[in-house]
Amino acid sequence: KVVWRYLIDHGWDETCGGGVHWRELNEHTTSKHSCSTGPTAVMGCKMYLATQEQEYLDWAIKCYDYMLDVLQDKSDHLFYDNVRPNKDDPNLPGDLEKNKYSYNSGQPLQAACLLYKITGEQKYLDEAYAIAESCHKKWFMPYRSKELNLTFNILAPGHAWFNTIMCRGFFELYSIDNDRKYIDDIEKSMIHAWSSSCHQGNNLL
């Protein structure tokens, strides 16, 4: 609850029309990022599930809606990195930093799944499916594993931590529909990594 209070009291403000600042600096930041607003939505859902206190759900929806309204690329349902203030009115969103990273879409995917679980509203599940499909298309690639003698879609090279956070969204979706479409590729990626890159002396990859 202390962390949550800090996020809401100091992370969210009306710069860029809302959203959560992404880090602390000696000088005040102005941009709003997917990597901070998305996790706040997820945390709000989890705090609501733990406490049933409406404030958490209200903020989770507020953060999620901001992500869709300001930071989402509507053409593929994935999320841009951040938005900077409008030059004429800093309380409006301005220029977007349009790089896309896997974790920036994985957190709103997880939030959409959690909001569906909480509210039962189909729009959240529909959005979760759209995000998941685009994540799979962008951050997985066809691969032939000699070690496994299998062809599958492997997690593409990139930042392992980013991909781990993306996978949380796939796991949350799987907990709803039990469809192994994405889980199978994640599992095979991990088994391939273990089979091909495990250090025998310490079992680290």
Where in the sequence are the language-model features?
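CBM-like carbohydrate-recognition segments
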Residues: 10, 32, 130, 134-205
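Well-ordered alpha-helical segments within folded domains of soluble proteins
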Residues: 1, 32-48, 97-117, 157-174
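Structural helix-adjacent loops and short alpha-helical linkers that scaffold large soluble proteins
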Residues: 1, 47-62, 74-75, 113-129, ...
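Extended ligand-binding groove/face enriched in aromatic
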Residues: 1-47, 57-58
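Acidic/His metal-coordination segments adjacent to aromatic residues that form catalytic metal sites
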Residues: 22-26, 82-96, 139-152
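Ligand/cofactor pocket segment of small-molecule handling proteins
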Residues: 42, 67-102
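Oxyanion-binding "anion nests"
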Residues: 101-119, 124-140
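Amphipathic alpha-helical segments of tetratricopeptide repeats
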Residues: 8-9, 49, 65-69, 117, ...
